[in-house]
Amino acid sequence: YRRDYSSSAGDTRLNALKPAVTNFSNTVAAKTVGVDGVAGTADDVNHRIAVVGYASRYDSNKRWKNTEVFVGANQYNYNTNASQYYGSAFQDMHTPTGKANITASIGAFDADGATYTNYGLEMANGILNANPVPDGETRNRVIVLFTDGYPGRNADNFDRNAANAALTQATIAKNNGVSLYSVGIFPGADATTAGDYNGSNTDAANWFMQQVSSNNGTPQSPSYYLSAADAGTL
């Protein structure tokens, strides 16, 4: 799993994302006890979560800020040492340490930078590749992409190059058997429309969110693209 965040919309959307991601991680942790609801029995499941953040890149005003892999509250930047921690990024959600580390990661989220989604997905792929499923074990591999803005340097302007780079990374993930969910809280986010690459910024953003998810461009029910216009809905 991945929790990715963009930053250019500021604290308001970040404050909406934090409880949403917390609820997600708590739900995953609750599922580790299996159908019987009792920890330490045969049907326990060791669900795991890893967290990355994405924001700025090399040509941003704050170069590579908030583009990182989290291990607990520690942050390892994409441009320096993030790849060294791909192998240790996953946290076991059936253990107190794993749950505490994910809580600490969520607490360390910051809102400052751009919205280069492609780097978040690239790091997500790196973590999955560094942690192959052992022989004889079955796992569903999932990326959950949270974003509060359009892909690119400015959250209010759709950047086609950034979007296309993200779609390349999404295709890599899907070709490796990953299910990819996208969650948008930017103004105009609408999971019921296919969007339009050549339309307005909002139309293009909805097109992107459909394409990057495992909807693969076609609105579905249930959907791999989830949207919420405000914190309460999310």
Mark where each language-model region is:
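P/S/T/G-enriched low-complexity
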Residues: 1-234
